[in-house]
């Protein structure tokens, strides 16, 4: 096995930078995500976590997509605003993750030497969906990441990726912080929207009152 410890350190540092910037809604986070995941494609393949390796190829593509969405994905090519999912969307997401986990977990268990195939599959498919949530600025992504990263800690520790396992402990803490930051931004966003509606309605009401005299 290649001595990838130093390379893992670089990937971890970039991953921390990604999350710190994402919390602040800074689109530079996607540059850090792209290069960090490029490194992890090789690392995970080397330790027989094939679903995780494939996941990071997907992450690289999503880094490009996420950057575009944060820059131009909103109305009139403006940046996206924070949103949240309704209960039905969460139920559909969970069912989709469960189905994909069962299918790919079985395929890996019967056809490859993959380690912990079902856990590997769960964290992979859950992360696939949650990354879309991040790219679309769905606030609930932070809660999903807490679950995914908690499960992934054991997966990486088992494969002796100790720095990455430690990174995920930090990720859980930062996910809580990220949720609080985005929730505050969402509240401010809603307050600004309500204020704008009131400003638009006030002149209409004033005109109607004047005409009735």
Label each region the model flagged.
Residues 13-18, 26, 30-66:
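Early transmembrane hairpin module of multi-pass membrane proteins
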Residues 51, 69, 163:
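Short, flexible micro-motifs
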Residues 1-25, 73-75, 84-213:
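Polytopic alpha-helical membrane-helix bundles and their juxtamembrane interface segments
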């Amino acid at each position: 096995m290649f001595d990838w410890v130093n390379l893992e350190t670089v990937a971890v540092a970039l991953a921390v930078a990604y999350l710190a910037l994402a919390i602040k809604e800074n689109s530079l986070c996607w540059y850090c995500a792209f290069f960090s995941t490029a490194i992890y494609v090789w690392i995970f393949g080397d330790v027989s976590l094939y679903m995780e390796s494939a996941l990071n190829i997907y992450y690289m593509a999503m880094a490009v997509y996420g950057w575009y969405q944060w820059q131009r994905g909103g109305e009139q090519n403006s940046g996206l605003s924070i949103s949240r999912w309704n209960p039905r969307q969460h139920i559909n997401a969970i069912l989709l993750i469960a189905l994909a986990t069962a299918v790919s977990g079985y395929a890996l268990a019967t056809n490859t030497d993959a380690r912990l195939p079902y856990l590997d599959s769960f964290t992979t498919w859950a992360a696939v969906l949650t990354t879309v949530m991040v790219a679309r600025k769905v606030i609930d992504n932070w809660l999903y990441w807490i679950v995914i990263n908690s499960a992934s800690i054991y997966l990486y520790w088992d494969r002796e990726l100790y720095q990455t396992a430690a990174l995920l402990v930090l990720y859980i803490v930062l996910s809580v912080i990220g949720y609080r930051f985005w929730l505050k931004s969402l509240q401010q966003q809603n307050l600004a929207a309500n204020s704008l509606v009131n400003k638009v309605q006030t002149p209409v009401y004033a005109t109607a009152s004047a005409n009735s005299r």
